């Protein structure tokens, strides 16, 4: 089957990572069917420059299908027709006023993942399911200390038991970690038991888990600087933009460029040459480069004009910082799949900072017109 005949079902296409995956998937020549909770978001995707360029360069199909609730028993049962690959990027985030983090975040992540796997099990055309996991799913998050005993790297095969409710009580960020951990464990359990619900069909696909660290870099659908820093970028370019205290936040200073994350997802779709199909198996890939927060300010001062950072009131003039620690990860397999070393911190900060600058320049220009 030629790539132009292959169809990728993509979740999370409006997010930081998901949109980047969408663009690179189209650029690689795949047709895409994107799930949306709100179909009005399709216009923003279709009108974006990178998507328009990708569609005009090749004869491809980009379609959208509404999946309002990932936890519904047959949420994906009707959307996988003729799909050859599934890329599940969407992450459960706290929505509305719900204070039940288990229901709002963890159950959505776990049940959504199970539903996708079960639907794929019932769709013979699916050959591969690629899932966006996280390094937070495989390291112990309590207590927060260095995860790297002398001489040992955390590997993609490491796992962590599900967290109990006391760990994430009242903390949506910890609930996100618990959700990623539980979803990864649910994926492993599915493959181990071929838990496909009522079907007795043998498995006919494999699973690829992509495990990024903090994802820095431009956001394709961002409209304002606050959109850019809403998410993991707050710990990247957001460090020199946030004027509020960090209140003792301590985090793992390991990051990756959104372009690398997206490209690894797309390369993982190649089940012929780059990553041959292994039915019933899972293969996992970690992305991350170590950094020190003080390096972010140094990059900004080196790469951007003085007026953007010289005073504390400047766009990139914030002086605060957070506490940090390092974890050693085995990233060799991901770099081999990518085909090159990961982009460094400087590229991550420069690219996201440049997006902020262009936005602000555009706002200034419009205000004078």
Curated annotation (Swiss-Prot):
Pathway: Mycotoxin biosynthesis. Disruption phenotype: Leads to a strong reduction by at least 90% of the production of fumonisins B1, B2, B3 and B4, and accumulates 3-keto homologs of fumonisins B3 and B4. NAD-dependent epimerase/dehydratase; part of the gene cluster that mediates the biosynthesis of fumonisins B1 (FB1), B2 (FB2), B3 (FB3), and B4 (FB4), which are carcinogenic mycotoxins. Within the pathway, FUM13 stereospecifically reduces the intermediate 3-keto intermediate 2-amino-3-oxo-12,16-dimethylicosane to the 3-hydroxyl product 2-amino-3-hydroxy-12,16-dimethylicosane. The biosynthesis starts with the FUM1-catalyzed carbon chain assembly from one molecule of acetyl-CoA, eight molecules of malonyl-CoA, and two molecules of methionine (in S-adenosyl form). Transmembrane segments: none annotated. It holds the Pfam family Epimerase. One of its GO terms (biological process) is fumonisin biosynthetic process. This is NAD-dependent epimerase/dehydratase FUM13. Keywords: Oxidoreductase. It comes from the Eukaryota. PANTHER family: NAD DEPENDENT EPIMERASE/DEHYDRATASE, STEROL-4-ALPHA-CARBOXYLATE 3-DEHYDROGENASE, DECARBOXYLATING. Its EC number is 1.1.1.-. It comes from Gibberella moniliformis (strain M3125 / FGSC 7600) (Maize ear and stalk rot fungus). Belongs to the NAD(P)-dependent epimerase/dehydratase family. Dihydroflavonol-4-reductase subfamily. The gene is FUM13. One of its GO terms (molecular function) is oxidoreductase activity, acting on the CH-OH group of donors, NAD or NADP as acceptor.
């Amino acid at each position: 089957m030629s790539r132009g005949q292959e169809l990728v079902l993509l979740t999370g296409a409006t997010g930081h990572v998901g949109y980047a995956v969408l663009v690179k998937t189209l650029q690689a020549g795949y047709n895409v069917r994107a799930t949306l909770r709100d179909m009005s978001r399709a216009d923003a995707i279709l009108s974006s420059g990178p998507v328009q360029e990708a569609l005009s360069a090749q004869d491809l199909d980009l379609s959208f299908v509404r999946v309002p609730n990932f936890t519904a028993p047959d949420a994906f049962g009707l959307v996988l027709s003729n799909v050859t690959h599934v890329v599940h990027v969407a992450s459960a985030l706290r929505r509305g006023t719900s204070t039940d983090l288990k229901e709002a975040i963890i159950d959505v992540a776990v049940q959504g993942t199970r539903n996708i796997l079960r639907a794929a099990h019932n769709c013979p055309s699916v050959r591969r399911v690629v899932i966006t996991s996280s390094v937070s799913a495989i390291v112990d998050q309590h207590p927060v200390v260095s995860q790297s005993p002398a001489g040992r790297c955390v590997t993609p095969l490491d796992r962590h038991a599900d967290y109990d409710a006391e760990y994430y009580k009242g903390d949506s960020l910890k609930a996100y970690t618990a959700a990623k951990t539980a979803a990864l464990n649910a994926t492993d359990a599915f493959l181990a038991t071929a838990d496909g619900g009522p079907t007795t069909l043998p498995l006919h696909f494999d699973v690829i888990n992509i495990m990024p660290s903090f994802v820095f870099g431009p956001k394709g659908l961002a409209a304002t600087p606050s959109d850019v820093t809403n998410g993991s970028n707050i710990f990247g370019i957001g460090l020199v933009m946030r004027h509020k205290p960090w209140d003792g936040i301590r985090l793992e200073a390991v990051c990756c460029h959104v372009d690398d994350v997206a490209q690894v997802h797309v390369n993982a779709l190649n089940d012929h040459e780059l990553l041959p199909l292994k039915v019933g198996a899972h293969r996992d890939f970690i992305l991350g480069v170590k950094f020190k927060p003080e390096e972010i300010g140094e990059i900004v001062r080196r790469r951007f004009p003085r007026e953007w950072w010289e005073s504390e009131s400047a766009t990139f003039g914030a002086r605060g910082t957070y506490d940090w620690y390092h974890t050693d990860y085995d990233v060799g397999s991901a770099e081999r799949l990518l085909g090159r070393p990961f982009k460094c911190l400087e590229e991550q900060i420069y690219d996201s900072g440049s997006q902020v600058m262009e936005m602000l320049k555009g706002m200034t220009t419009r205000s004078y017109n």
